Amino acid sequence: MINIRPDEISSIIREQIEQYDQDVKIDNIGTVLQVGDGIARVYGLDQVMSGELLEFEDKTIGIALNLENDNVGVVLMGNGRQILEGGSVKSTGQIAQIPVGEAFLGRVVNPLGAPIDGKGDIASTETRLVESMAPGIISRKSVCEPLQTGITSIDAMIPIGRGQRELIIGDRQTGKTSIAVDTIINQKTEDVVCVYVGIGQKASTIAQVVNVLDEKEAMAYTIIVSASANDPATLQYIAPYSGAALAEYFMYNGKATLIVYDDLTKQAMAYRQMSLLLRRPPGREAYPGDVFYLHSRLLERAAKLSDALGGGSMTALPIIETQASDVSAYIPTNVISITDGQIFLSNDLFNSGIRPAINVGISVSRVGSAAQTKAMKQVAGKLKLELAQFAELEAFSQFASDLDEATQKQLARGTRLREILKQPQNSPLSVAQQVALIYAGINGFLDNLAVSDVKKFSASLIQTLASQKSYIDVVGKTNQFTEEAETLLKEAIASTKTGFATL
């Protein structure tokens, strides 16, 4: 027979009564009126905030974007196939935020901060709002430190400073992503945290970027945020903001960060798709009226912080894809007006074998010159002018048959300078190496070399300097092109030249 112990039963009941929670929990619940194309119309959520996260019955999360008289327009962060008409929707009382922290370095995540690289969960205790305010005027400091890309033509003529926004713009397949990836690889010795945001890219393209960064040991200081072409438009729309939130964590902790948005054209397209489905009035090229604000609020988050806030920085390299080199289209002109300069990549230059295919004539850096190293300023001061004059003369020389000697010399030097600025992919150069090559070209040391030998000479000179070390040490320590450095460089050029036939 079972022995019943009343004292035990009464103690359990007493414990249950003590733990009883009398609080009444009120949930704000609505009903799905309509769902499809990544959009849901919800009735009954009168208390919802703009931008608030909503949870559907199948655990899909959505963002309330349109607050109308009789319903709420919600964009879905999943495929929404399990959401049914008449189903319930619960407001969460939260705005979109993602986990952040050091543990994200070396990982590939989606725009919600969830890992997608199969390497397990990411341990994180901190979160940041996906859409947070940009630093104000007092919180900022003017750009004063260089961010070396390792690409000679950029560091010499279109210098980028830490905290700057420099647009990379050009047609498809002109090497835009390559410039951004090379810049990330070049930060290996610079203690810069990098974030690469792939928006609407093919998954294979993002996998290729991850592989290149892995090979070059750059993943150790890089975070990849991926919203590929098969992800919902909502994820493609918030991906850049999520990337900015991850970079901001490091920036506010006093570190230098670099963020690449590849590319903002596809983000604008995703936003246009969402806006049209939400029945917002279309404007120019069917984009909604606030597409300028879409990009300006994102790019304003890049800054060089004041010393009082730790002196961290976020440098942004947004990428824009043009159609048939049309820089005057809506999205390109918007982003050009927001950024502090642009690097324009030309299809014609790319096809003629000049890579990186940078059109120096219409590329500009508005604030970077203040951050350029003194050594580069001393040597590359007249490089842009030389190349501009050369381009003009080259166009003229196609029509003129007999050219005077001075013009022929200028054309010969320009051709050799252009050869020096050609650079293979994934092989960034240090400042000292760049200074050496430009010095050799601009001061006529290559004028009597065959054009076909210039590339080989450049490679040999870099090897010679690497074996001697003294020149690289002088420029590296002082960041100036001193008389001692010039003497050492002249000796290296002379010894390298002995292995080449002169004209």
From Swiss-Prot:
UniProt keyword Plastid, yes or no: yes
Pfam families: ATP-synt_ab, ATP-synt_ab_C, ATP-synt_ab_N
Any single GO CC term annotated in Swiss-Prot or TrEMBL for this entry: chloroplast thylakoid membrane
Database matches in SUPFAM superfamilies: C-terminal domain of alpha and beta subunits of F1 ATP synthase (SSF47917), N-terminal domain of alpha and beta subunits of F1 ATP synthase (SSF50615), P-loop containing nucleoside triphosphate hydrolases (SSF52540)
Binding site for ATP: 170-177
Endpoints of the signal sequence: none
UniProt-annotated location(s): Plastid, Chloroplast thylakoid membrane
Catalytic reaction list: ATP + H2O + 4 H(+)(in) = ADP + phosphate + 5 H(+)(out)
Protein name according to UniProt: ATP synthase subunit alpha, chloroplastic
Family per record: Belongs to the ATPase alpha/beta chains family.
Enzyme Commission number(s) of this protein: 7.1.2.2
Keyword Lyase part of the UniProt annotation: no
Function: Produces ATP from ADP in the presence of a proton gradient across the membrane. The alpha chain is a regulatory subunit.
Gene expressing this chain: atpA
Biological process per Gene Ontology, one example term: proton motive force-driven ATP synthesis
InterPro entries attached to this UniProt entry: ATP_synth_asu-like_sf, ATP_synth_asu_C, ATP_synth_asu_C_sf, ATP_synth_F1_a_nt-bd_dom, ATP_synth_F1_asu, ATPase_a/bsu_AS, ATPase_F1/V1/A1_a/bsu_N, ATPase_F1/V1/A1_a/bsu_N_sf
Site (Required for activity): 363
Subunit structure and binding partners: F-type ATPases have 2 components, CF(1) - the catalytic core - and CF(0) - the membrane proton channel. CF(1) has five subunits: alpha(3), beta(3), gamma(1), delta(1), epsilon(1). CF(0) has four main subunits: a, b, b' and c.
